[in-house]
Curated annotation (Swiss-Prot):
Highest taxon above the source species: Bacteria
Full protein name: Catalase-peroxidase
Keyword terms, alphabetized: Heme, Hydrogen peroxide, Iron, Metal-binding, Oxidoreductase, Peroxidase, Signal
Leader sequence residues: 1-22
Cross-link (Tryptophyl-tyrosyl-methioninium (Tyr-Met) (with W-114)): Y234-M260
Swiss-Prot/TrEMBL catalytic activity: H2O2 + AH2 = A + 2 H2O; 2 H2O2 = O2 + 2 H2O
Length: 744
């Protein structure tokens, strides 16, 4: 374990100790909560306990709609135009309990949509608006999401009307689009297809800070974090750690937006476009604000931040503490943001709540009041707005947008679409009448199938040629795994479709063993070429399909070597992407720092290898049983990087046996660390001391962790051989098809 990983676990232990020391006993010494969720929990006692439970998230047990519910089918029944018309009416239907600024809810709905999608992180594909997670903690109570609860509550009558024909996840993004359109902006398009989840994501690492708005320096701003302070979407609008410095703020803006896959032009367009509308809220000190939604009283009914200042809403609203309105037409698209940014000199001032902001020096009173048509204000800006003028790179882009409003509008439309659709996945998932026709590079496009597909007889013939090619079972299975296991369940990127394993950057990743991959792919490409040259009726097979088919052939051979006759399911229809259709800079983030399924980890891994294994399994949407059976099977076949013998607890490598489990759980073997790093272990005969096996932390955790051991015992039992092969084939097929949304 690296020193960094050890510090990580020690910090968790200290946090838990502080928590336990802060508890108090009741006068009687009895538990004050007489139900199963009360009292000290396992993680209070063992804070470093492996989070196997993360693999159980979003199970059918938490879904009220049931396994038979088909969201795609329901969405297609939606009266899309009627819904949009209802949303248009909502924009100016101001409610007394939460009056609309400038008589238009549009700006706050733009913010709602932005903050739903804006949690996306390129590094691990998590976050974003694709699951409707803004409804749940922690996002529903982040300081940066103050009063967005009101936006969702305003939407509830419309969600109630259309029911399950549109998810909350889709509705929040669509509402942002409609808001922009009603304020005179032409959007790039909209695609539905986001399915709601029904409980908070527990797998997203938002940071280890224990206080809201804890500042992170650039030096400590580790991936995959996408915000500079705990509880913010991106950066502190007052500047880093509230320093009021636009220049230093620009560095943080550039870093955070890059982690969301946005370049400098997209960043400037998004900030300028978003701040064309609406205002911030800082009518008085934040001490007037009540608790956030998760901490609010029962009778608040899920609403938070109730204010005791004045009316608590309208002109008296307290949100971020800043009191800024950027443009003369805050409910209408314009170029006033950039015009004001460059027209005035700016002096630092304070909002009524005491937050750092900027006011136009000697500026005229031209900015409308949000609730009093008789009042006007001087132009105001945030520290982070001024970054677009005083950072030399941002300044050039901003001036171009100032001089060319059409270029600004086009850039904002495209950046907004990317922001709100980045985690929706490939175009095959897109639904609705407003899906743009243009194919965009960041969508990871693959060509459409333009030929008849192979049938079962063709697949059998291809597998026979693969097995006669001289490639080993390990090479076939390992290559297919390398191709398919790049999939990430968060943003639906990666997977075998496209055969991008043959392209940069994947072909050069150390985990993919470039020399071996090159050898295997050359052989498979020859087989593909021969088939396509000689096939009748115009049939063709893609290399992507051949890679998966070859892996299936390897699994079948491994099962045969263990005495089992199985047929691994196969669905043709993958196509091969080109290098021009592959954004290498974006795909580099899919390279695994660790892949426990191949017993691989980079030097200096930031977390223990078993933690990285759970993370990888969760990205692959695997359950704990699926994780367990895959590890056992892949160790038996031995797809370890560089052919390492760690975890290959068998004298029959290449056969799909349960030997990994039986030998790991064999009490005649005693395990000890092989070095100070505690990354590799030796298993010796308990009586003679003879070395029998070597294993990694990933291998040994299936005997150490109580949950994983319980699962390992199932497959180590004498009656489990058939079940093991059946379960392995099912889990293998799942991984091979993770990106086959066309099969749904």
């Amino acid at each position: 374990m690296s020193p960094r990983a050890r510090r990580c676990t020690d910090r968790c232990a200290r946090m838990s100790e502080r928590s336990m020391n802060a508890t108090t006993e009741t006068p009687t010494g009895k538990c004050p909560v007489a139900h199963g969720t009360g009292g000290t929990q396992n993680r209070d006692w063992w804070p470093n306990q492996l989070r196997v439970d993360l693999l159980n998230l979003h199970s059918p047990k938490s879904d009220p709609l049931g396994a038979a519910f088909d969201y795609r089918a329901e969405f297609k029944k939606l009266d899309y135009e009627a819904l949009k018309n209802d949303l248009r009416k909502l924009m100016t239907d101001s409610q007394d309990w939460w009056p609309a600024d400038f008589g238009n809810y549009g700006p706050q709905f733009v913010r709602m949509a932005w903050h739903s999608a804006g949690t996306y992180r390129l590094a691990d594909g998590r976050g974003g608006g694709g699951r409707g997670q803004q409804r749940f903690a922690p996002l529903n109570s982040w300081p940066d999401n103050v009063n967005i609860d009101k936006s969702r509550r305003l939407l509830w009558p419309i969600k109630q009307k259309y029911g399950q024909k549109i998810s909350w996840a889709d509705l929040m993004i669509l509402t942002g689009n409609v808001a922009l359109e009603t304020m005179g902006f032409r959007t790039f398009g909209f695609a539905g297809g986001r399915e709601d989840t029904w409980e908070p994501d527990q797998d997203v690492f938002w940071g280890s800070e224990t206080a809201w708005l804890s500042h992170r320096t650039l030096e400590k701003f580790d991936a995959p974090l996408g915000a500079t302070e705990m509880g913010l979407i991106y950066v502190n609008p007052e500047g880093p750690d509230r320093n009021g410095d636009p220049i230093s703020a620009a560095k943080f803006i550039r870093e955070t937006f890059a982690r969301m896959a946005m370049n400098d032009e997209e960043t400037v367009a998004l900030i300028g476009g978003g701040h064309t509308f609406g205002k911030t809220h800082g009518a008085a000190a934040e001490s007037h604000k009540g608790p956030d939604p998760e901490a609010a009283a029962l009778e608040a009914q899920g609403l938070g931040w109730a204010s005791n200042y004045g009316t608590g809403h309208g002109a008296d609203t307290i949100g971020s503490g800043l009191e800024v309105t950027w443009t003369q037409t805050p409910a209408q698209w314009s170029n006033f943001f950039f015009e004001n940014l460059f027209k005035y000199e700016w002096v630092q001032t304070r909002s009524p709540a005491g937050a750092i902001q900027w006011e136009a020096k000697d500026g005229p009173d031209i900015i409308p009041d949000a609730h009093n048509p008789e009042k006007k204000h001087k132009p105001t800006m945030l520290t982070t707005d001024l970054s677009l003028r005083f950072d030399p790179i941002y300044e050039k882009i901003s001036r171009r947008f100032l001089e060319n409003p059409q270029a600004f509008a086009e850039a904002f439309a495209r950046a907004w679409f990317k922001l709100t659709h980045r985690d929706l996945g490939p175009r095959s998932r897109y639904l609705g009448p407003e899906v743009p026709r243009e194919v965009l590079l960041w969508q990871d496009p693959v060509p459409a199938v333009d030929h008849p597909l192979i049938d079962d007889a063709d697949a059998a013939a291809l597998k026979a040629k693969v097995l006669a090619s001289g490639l080993t079972v390990s090479e076939l299975v390992g290559t297919a795994w390398a191709s398919a296991s790049t999939f990430r369940g968060g943003d639906k990127r990666g997977g075998a479709n496209g055969a991008r394993i043959r392209l940069a950057p994947q072909k050069d990743w150390a985990v993919n063993q470039p020399e071996q991959i090159d050898k295997v792919l050359k052989a498979l490409t020859r087989i593909q070429g021969e088939f396509n040259l000689n096939a009748s009726d115009g049939k063709k097979v893609s290399l992507a399909d051949v890679i998966v088919l070859a892996g299936n052939a390897g699994v079948e051979e491994a099962a045969k070597a263990a005495g089992h006759d199985v047929s691994v399911p196969f669905a043709p229809g993958r196509t091969d992407a080109s290098q021009a259709e592959t954004d290498a800079d974006s795909f580099k983030w899919l390279e695994p720092a660790a892949d426990g399924f191949r017993n691989y980890q980079k030097d200096g891994l930031a977390v223990p290898a078993e933690v990285a294994l759970i993370d990888k399994a969760q990205l692959l949407t695997l359950t704990a049983p699926e994780l367990t059976v895959l590890i056992g099977g892949l160790r038996a076949i031995n797809i370890n990087v560089d052919g390492a013998k760690h975890g290959v607890f068998t004298d029959k490598p290449g056969a799909l046996t349960t030997d990994f489990f039986t030998n790991l759980l064999d009490m005649s073997t005693q395990w000890k660390a092989a070095g100070e790093s505690n990354d590799v272990y030796e298993g010796r005969d308990r009586q003679t001391g003879e070395l029998k096996w070597t294993g990694t932390r990933v291998d040994l955790v299936f005997g150490s962790n109580s949950i994983l051991r319980a699962l390992a015992e199932v497959y180590a039992a004498s009656d489990a051989k058939d079940k093991f092969v059946t379960d392995f084939v099912a889990a293998w097929t799942k991984v091979m098809n993770l990106d086959r949304f066309d099969l749904a």
